[in-house]
A protein has these predicted regions:
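N-terminal Rossmann-like NAD(P) cofactor-binding subdomain of oxidoreductases
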Residues: 1-180, 216, 240, 249, ...
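Oxyanion-binding "anion nests"
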Residues: 175-227
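Generic solvent-exposed, charged/amphipathic alpha-helical segments
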Residues: 7, 204-208, 248, 252
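Short acidic/glycine-rich loop or secondary-structure boundary segments that cap or lie
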Residues: 149-152, 192-195, 226-229, 244-245
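C-terminal active-site/capping subdomain that shapes the small-molecule cofactor and substrate pocket
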Residues: 215-326
Length: 326
């Protein structure tokens, strides 16, 4: 799903391309995709000289593949923008969200830039707007993550589960630990020793690295039976109180954000209506009733677009803009 989204995003944004090469596993090699009227065949990814002359390589093939082929991809000077978790916490690999820390992309000793986890990306875009006003000390976040975050096959399984339940048939469960249709699953990825899942710890560790901050993030990540776009309920504690008016203005003017906050008219972000959109949408902005330095708000973002392909392409656009590639 993310690979095809890359092609859509590159085309939508009129990304400057002299030549587009597609690489994949033996399963994908030989497939053909049309891009800007030209048919391109997927080549087999191998340890050879295929990346000679390549300026930017977008990789979204999983951590194992990224680690195995990183040297092959970068050895002739290509910038590898990697969507996997392989390098995110490596000290010599920048972890970049262009609305937050674009300049980090300029220091990449290994020629690799890491794309953060989808839930982290949309959260830090929103946090940055408030961090510009006053330092954020703590974050509590609960995520509501769509089925497609686990891949296209997982989304297909959710469709099939709904059909099976409504038809009174036995339910197929393969992509998730339990039936997702008519259910919520409070586990994404495996559990770690501290009782948090790897997904939840990504939000803690990645946020600190991206924001260059001592911010503490406590997350609960939940898989929900929505198809596309992740939602997050976020509570923050700031060093000084931030008024609702200040917060609304900051979100309205924030890079990559759209304010959608009119409770009287029942206007707030919802995943059903925001799939396929580029920005992160913010609504339900309130003062916290338990802490005078607290704010709470709700965000929705398309995890395949801003949470993956779009963020990577925006990193590349930044490098081109500042003439730091090619």
């Amino acid at each position: 799903a993310v690979g095809q989204e890359f092609l859509r995003v590159l085309d939508e944004r009129n990304f400057p391309i002299d030549e587009l090469l597609l690489f994949g596993s033996s399963r994908s090699a030989g497939r053909k995709y049309t891009f800007r009227g030209k048919e391109i065949e997927v080549k087999l990814l191998q340890h050879n000289d295929d990346f000679k002359g390549v300026d930017i390589a977008f990789t979204s093939a999983g951590a194992g593949t990224s680690k195995e082929f990183a040297e092959t991809i970068t050895k002739y000077g290509a910038v590898m923008i990697d969507n996997s978790s392989a390098f995110r916490m490596d000290t010599d690999v920048p972890l970049v969200v262009p609305e937050v820390n674009p300049e980090d992309a300029l220091t990449r000793p290994r020629g690799i830039i890491a794309n953060p986890n989808c839930t982290t990306i949309q959260m830090v875009v929103a946090l940055k707007a408030i961090e510009n006003l006053t330092h954020i000390k703590r974050v509590h976040v609960s995520t509501y993550q769509a089925a497609s975050g686990a891949g296209a096959a997982a989304m297909d399984e959710l469709y099939e589960q709904y059909r099976q339940v409504l038809a009174g048939e036995p339910v197929t469960v393969e992509k998730f630990a339990y039936q997702l249709a008519f259910n919520l699953i409070p586990q994404i990825d495996v559990f770690t020793d501290n009782g948090y899942t790897k997904e939840e710890m990504k939000m803690f560790n990645e946020t600190r690295k991206i924001m260059h901050s001592d911010i503490k993030v406590s997350a609960t990540c939940v898989r929900v039976p929505a198809l596309r776009s992740h939602s997050e309920s976020i509570w923050i504690e700031t060093e000084r109180p931030v008024s609702i008016e200040e917060a609304r203005k900051a979100f309205a003017e924030g890079d990559g954000l759209v304010l959608m906050d009119n409770p009287a008219e029942k206007e707030y972000p919802m995943p059903l209506f925001l799939a396929g959109k580029d920005p992160v949408y913010v609504g339900r902005i309130r003062k916290d009733l338990a802490d005078e330095n607290g704010l709470t708000f709700w965000i929705v973002g398309d995890q395949i677009k801003k949470g993956a392909a779009l963020n990577a392409v925006q990193i590349a656009e930044y490098l081109i803009k500042v003439k730091n590639v090619g």
